[in-house]
């Protein structure tokens, strides 16, 4: 694992014109900005046309609040960006550094987005074949074509495969992969039981294979994760532990919370 961590420090993505985008999607900015402009217009109309001061003050407060919100999420987006604060790259380093893996066989990433973690895994283990699956909905500016383009520019296209998939029902037989990884994906699957999603990901992991599944594991969504970790141990899984990635990747819980990932935890173990 120390050697793996050394490799992570020497891999820097996004230096060949790749586009890894941001999980803070453009539509979010458009919506907040649009509402802010509307509120500002209504404030002006309330003061100077309708002469209703109470409404003017209300819309002015809403406008200011939305401007502050827009500044905040712009800062968050910049911190996560591969061309900015590179926080997400640090998260990826932490995830892979916890895998006790010799580099042979196949790796699956559940929810690959723009392909960044899949590509980093391929660069870390030159003998491995890495498969990234994603639903690629309309909310984010990600696609299979974007992933393939990024992999080609990083020089790992021959070992990376990207395909459409659903985390609730993976289109692979039991015990298909030597490694399963994921990063901030499961909480986006609306209406799903988070622990069942984790078990579905572990279903396709080979006996003896390792996993590192990172997410914002709020108790109201995930339930008792310490209990779930014990459940895995009772099922025969080994070396199961929960890593506090809010601390390890972000440096402090307060900083992670400011970036809306204050409950970030990594489930690690061996099947």
Would you name each region that the model predicts?
Residues 236, 249-271:
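Core SAM-dependent methyltransferase catalytic element
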Residues 168-180:
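A short acidic, Gly/Pro-enriched loop at the edge of an enzyme's catalytic core
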């Amino acid at each position: 694992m120390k050697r793996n961590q050394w490799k992570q420090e020497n891999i820097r993505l996004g230096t060949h014109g790749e586009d890894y985008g941001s999980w803070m999607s453009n539509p979010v900015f458009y919506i907040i900005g649009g509402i802010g402009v509307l509120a500002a217009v209504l404030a002006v109309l309330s003061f100077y046309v309708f002469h209703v001061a109470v409404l003017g003050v209300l819309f002015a407060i809403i406008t200011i609040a939305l401007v502050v919100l827009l500044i905040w999420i712009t800062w968050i987006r910049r911190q996560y960006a591969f061309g900015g604060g590179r926080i997400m790259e640090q998260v990826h380093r932490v995830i892979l550094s916890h895998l006790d893996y010799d580099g042979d066989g196949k790796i699956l990433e559940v929810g690959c987005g723009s392909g960044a973690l899949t590509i980093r895994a391929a660069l870390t283990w030159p003998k491995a074949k890495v498969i990234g699956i994603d639903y690629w909905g309309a909310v984010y500016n990600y696609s299979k074509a974007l992933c393939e383009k990024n992999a080609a520019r990083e020089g790992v296209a021959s070992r990376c495969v990207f395909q459409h998939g659903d985390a609730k029902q993976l289109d692979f037989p039991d015990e298909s992969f030597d490694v399963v990884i994921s990063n901030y994906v499961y909480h986006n699957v609306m209406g799903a039981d988070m622990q069942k999603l984790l078990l579905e990901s572990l279903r396709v992991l080979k006996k003896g294979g390792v996993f590192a599944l990172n997410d914002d594991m709020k108790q109201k969504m995930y339930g008792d994760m310490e209990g779930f970790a014990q459940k895995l141990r009772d099922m025969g899984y080994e070396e199961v532990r929960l890593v506090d990635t809010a601390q390890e990747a972000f440096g402090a819980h307060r900083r992670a919370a400011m970036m809306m990932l204050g409950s970030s935890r990594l489930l690690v173990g061996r099947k």
